[in-house]
C-alpha cells in the first residue's frame, strides 16, 4: 500500500531533522519509541501514485499532499499493520490534523492499535487515551494501550475494541472535554464493557516527563490496581 511506503520513508529520514527530533525528545520519546510506532517527518511529501478512490480523496484532502509536509506524522495502522490513516502535528502552528482512508472510516482507527493488539488479546483489556503522546507514555507500563485521537469513542472504534477486549478502560484527561467524553461514552454504550480512571490532574505524558520512568510506572500502577483486579 502506498501509505505504508510513505510512512516507512518518513520514519527512516526523521532522525536527519533536528527540529522534530528535539520536539519528540522534549515530549519524552526515545529513538526506540520513534522506530516502534514508525513516527515520521518529511520536508517534501512524495507518495507513489495510485489509481484508487482512496488515493484521490487523500490527494484532495491534503492539498496534493502539501498538508503532510514539515509535519510530524503518526501512522494509524489496522490490525494487519497496514497504514489506513495519518495524524499530523504542525510544529509551528502547534495543531493536529487527521486523514483517513475509507477502511479507517468504516472499521475505526486508532494510533498504536497494531502495536498493542497482541497485549489486548492476551489480557482482554485495553486502555484508551485521547492523544498519541499519552498513549505512548502509558504503554511503557501497560502495552495494551491505544489512542482514540479524540475524547469520545465512535461506534466503529467501540465495536473494533469490543471484538478483542472484554473491558475498555478510558484514561481521558481530567478536563471538560475528557469528562464529557467519558459521560457520553458511558451513556452511549453502557457500563458493562466500559470503565474509566483518572490518573491525576495531569496527563500520562506529563507524569512520565516529571517523574521519570521508574517512578512513573509505580505511580500509574497504584492508580489502576483496582481496575486490573476486576
Task: Mark where each language-model region is.
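TOPRIM fold recognition
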Residues: 84, 123-126, 135-230
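Short, functionally important structural connectors and interaction interfaces within domains
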Residues: 5-6, 21, 105, 145, ...
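TOPRIM metal-binding catalytic domain and adjacent DNA-binding surface shared by DnaG-type primases
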Residues: 1-71, 80, 120-121, 162, ...
